[in-house]
């Protein structure tokens, strides 16, 4: 079912000369760093759509997951949204959320997030009247304990 060539390159376009190619910082890095194409200021408690000026073609049966960078997370910067569908071809934008106490500045060329390619399965959904029971049932949000 997943007949994809893992050696096929992913095609991308730099939409402007401000765009920087996605990069991996080590041979085994899970994600490709995405870079801001512009300067932004994000006050505490606010969010901002950061444009990369990169568009790309996702591999077949894959989607792109926008994930936080650990160094930014340490500063209180998180990611909102974060899914690039297989058929999306527009400018990749990253929603940065400033959960910190201080204004956060993004400069042109800053690494803002990482793009991780993940396989996806498109199941057929079927509505039913009830589901099989399990020991856990409908117990959620902390029901399995802390330890």
Curated annotation (Swiss-Prot):
Superkingdom in the source lineage: Viruses
Protein name, as recorded: Deoxyuridine 5'-triphosphate nucleotidohydrolase
Role of this protein: This enzyme is involved in nucleotide metabolism: it produces dUMP, the immediate precursor of thymidine nucleotides and it decreases the intracellular concentration of dUTP so that uracil cannot be incorporated into DNA.
One Gene Ontology MF term: dUTP diphosphatase activity
InterPro entries: dUTPase, dUTPase-like, dUTPase-like_sf, dUTPase_trimeric
Positions of Mg(2+) binding: 24
Required co-factors: Mg(2+)
Phylogenetic lineage: Viruses, Varidnaviria, Bamfordvirae, Nucleocytoviricota, Pokkesviricetes
Induction, as annotated: Expressed in the early phase of the viral replicative cycle.
Family (UniProt): Belongs to the dUTPase family.
Binding residues annotated for dUTP, in chain numbering: 68-70, 82-85, 88, 93, 95, 111
Keyword Magnesium listed: yes
Keyword Magnesium: yes
UniProtKB keywords: Early protein, Hydrolase, Magnesium, Metal-binding, Nucleotide metabolism
GO biological process, one term: dUTP catabolic process
EC number from the UniProt entry: 3.6.1.23
Catalytic activity: dUTP + H2O = dUMP + diphosphate + H(+)
């Amino acid at each position: 079912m997943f007949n994809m060539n893992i050696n096929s390159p992913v095609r991308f376009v730099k939409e402007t000369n401000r765009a920087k190619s996605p990069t991996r910082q080590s041979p085994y890095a899970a994600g490709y760093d995405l870079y801001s194409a512009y300067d932004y200021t994000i006050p505490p408690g606010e969010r901002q759509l950061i444009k990369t000026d990169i568009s790309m073609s996702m591999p077949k049966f894959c989607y792109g997951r926008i994930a936080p960078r650990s160094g930014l997370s340490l500063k209180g910067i998180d990611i909102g949204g974060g899914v690039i569908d297989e058929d999306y071809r527009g400018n990749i934008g990253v929603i940065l959320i400033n959960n910190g106490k201080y204004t956060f500045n993004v400069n042109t060329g800053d690494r803002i997030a990482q793009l991780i390619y993940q396989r996806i399965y498109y199941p057929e959904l079927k509505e039913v009247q009830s589901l099989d029971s399990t020991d856990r049932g409908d117990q959620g949000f902390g029901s399995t304990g802390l330890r």
